[in-house]
């Protein structure tokens, strides 16, 4: 039973968002690191994300039954009742907001609330079944944890926040379009109008290339505007341009699944590397 409750929180999504929080928090903390603030920022944000993921699962039960990738999810198999899941999601969400507001700051709590509303209501409830641009709107919520990592320290919105926000929008679009190509048949079964379903795989591959290009440019601005060192720029550019190169090859490749899978996994490596590098950039 506990395993089922953990599963509906989508732990892998939570871990991915924690990576974003850690990177921006450690960057913004230098030269003083507050371990308690660090702990409560991660805990509060993780609980809010977990809550939003459960509500996402609840809203998508009918869709998930149609897709091979999701047909064995806990709520689809009724291992937990929708009522129990709703109560659990509401409880951990409220606790998460409370932790952020009381132990971090009101701004970070407010940002987490915005992310929650975008993901649950605008993306999952309103747009996912209606618009091929739902992924773009959903990426707004996925960029907010990185911003929260910074506002937990600064308690203000600045240019660095804006750059992080757009950097991770570009990253997410590249990442999720690769996923959409991998599972395009599932999305067709569920009648979801995701970009590759509506516009085709080739056009999606080209858009991935454009988004990665924008990601590289936006990441470089962190150096050109004085936030990060040129060592970061040099080292990270090597890996991000290789990601762009893979994307270019995928446009010409007929084996869509092979290169989309490669793009997907490499995008994970890129985001881990990015956050690792910004967290240690003070060394340089």
UniProtKB/Swiss-Prot annotation:
Coiled coil: none annotated. PROSITE patterns: UBIA (PS00943). GO terms for molecular function: protoheme IX farnesyltransferase activity. It comes from the Bacteria. It is a multi-pass membrane protein. Carbon 2 of the heme B porphyrin ring is defined according to the Fischer nomenclature. The chain crosses the membrane at residues 13-33, 35-55, 87-107, 108-128, 133-153, 162-182, 224-244, 264-284. Belongs to the UbiA prenyltransferase family. Protoheme IX farnesyltransferase subfamily. The keyword Coiled coil does not apply. It is found in: Cell membrane. It is an enzyme of class 2 (transferase). InterPro entries: Protohaem_IX_farnesylTrfase, UbiA_prenyltransferase, UbiA_prenylTrfase_CS, UbiA_sf. It catalyses: heme b + (2E,6E)-farnesyl diphosphate + H2O = Fe(II)-heme o + diphosphate. This is Protoheme IX farnesyltransferase. GO terms for biological process: heme O biosynthetic process. Converts heme B (protoheme IX) to heme O by substitution of the vinyl group on carbon 2 of heme B porphyrin ring with a hydroxyethyl farnesyl side group. It comes from Buchnera aphidicola subsp. Schizaphis graminum (strain Sg). The lineage of its organism: Bacteria, Pseudomonadati, Pseudomonadota, Gammaproteobacteria, Enterobacterales. Its EC number is 2.5.1.141. Keywords: Cell membrane, Heme biosynthesis, Membrane, Transferase, Transmembrane, Transmembrane helix. Pathway: Porphyrin-containing compound metabolism; heme O biosynthesis; heme O from protoheme: step 1/1. The keyword Transmembrane helix applies. Its main location: membrane.
